[in-house]
Amino acid sequence: MSKVLVLKSSILGGYSQSALLVDYLIGKWEKQGATITVRDLAGKDVLPMVDGEIASGLRGGAELTARQQEMLDLSNALVEELKANDTIVITAPMYNFNIPTQLKNWIDFVARAGVTFTYTENGPKGLVEGKRAVLITTRGGAHKDGPTDHMVPFLKTFLGFIGITDVDVVYAEALNMGPEANQKGISEAKASIDKLAV
C-alpha cells in the first residue's frame, strides 16, 4: 500500500485552486488504496519562521536553548515524516513568481546536512532516495517553461538535492485570465492528475 505525504501551502485554504486540485488527487488515490497524510503548512500545521537561533540549533550540538531543542525535535519529526512516505505531493501556488513562504519554511526545516543530504568529495548526495514527488502548481498567468517560472526549477533542484529525482509536475495555468481560461486550466490539470498512478 502506497504511503503519500501531501503538503498544502496556499494561504487561501479551502478556497484555493491548488486545494481543489490536490483534493481531487486525494479522492482518486484514496480509492486506489493509498494511505494519505496531509500537512497544511499555511493552516493548522504552520511552522515557525526559521531565524538565526533556529538555524543554528538545527545543526545540533550539546548546548541548545530550550527553543532550539524544540525546533530540532520538530525538524526531526518532519524529516521522519518525509522519509516514511513513498510519494510526496507538493501544492505550490505561484505568489509573485515564486513558492509560498510557508512552503519555503518547510524546506528550511528538512534540508539538513547529514540528515537529508551530505557532502562528499564528488559533491552533494541526497539521502532521501527511492521516493517520488508530484508538484501541483497553480498560476494566475501563463508561465510554464518560461523565464518567469522560478518555482518548478527551484523545487526540482531542492528535491534532487535531497535525493528525489522522480518528479511529475501538474500545471494549472492562466487561472486569472478569464472564466474560460480558468476552466481550461483546471480541466487540463485534472487530466494530468488522471494520468498519475499512485
From Swiss-Prot:
* Keyword ATP-binding belongs to the record: no
The record's disulfide annotation reads none
Q: How is the cofactor bound?
A: Binds 1 FMN per subunit.
Names of required cofactors: FMN
Q: Which reaction does it catalyse?
A: 2 a quinone + NADH + H(+) = 2 a 1,4-benzosemiquinone + NAD(+); N,N-dimethyl-1,4-phenylenediamine + anthranilate + 2 NAD(+) = 2-(4-dimethylaminophenyl)diazenylbenzoate + 2 NADH + 2 H(+)
Q: Which GO terms describe its molecular function?
A: electron transfer activity; FMN binding; oxidoreductase activity, acting on NAD(P)H as acceptor; oxidoreductase activity, acting on NAD(P)H, quinone or similar compound as acceptor
SUPFAM superfamilies, per database record? Flavoproteins (SSF52218)
User: Where does this protein have coiled-coil stretches?
Assistant: none
Q: Does the keyword ATP-binding apply?
A: no
Function, as annotated, reads: Quinone reductase that provides resistance to thiol-specific stress caused by electrophilic quinones. Also exhibits azoreductase activity. Catalyzes the reductive cleavage of the azo bond in aromatic azo compounds to the corresponding amines.
Which PANTHER family does this chain map to? Answer: FMN-DEPENDENT NADH-AZOREDUCTASE 1 (PTHR43741), FMN-DEPENDENT NADH:QUINONE OXIDOREDUCTASE (PTHR43741:SF2)
Which family does the similarity line name?
Belongs to the azoreductase type 1 family.
Q: How does it assemble?
A: Homodimer.
| Name of this protein | FMN-dependent NADH:quinone oxidoreductase
Q: Which organism is it from?
A: Shewanella oneidensis (strain ATCC 700550 / JCM 31522 / CIP 106686 / LMG 19005 / NCIMB 14063 / MR-1)
* Gene name as annotated: azoR
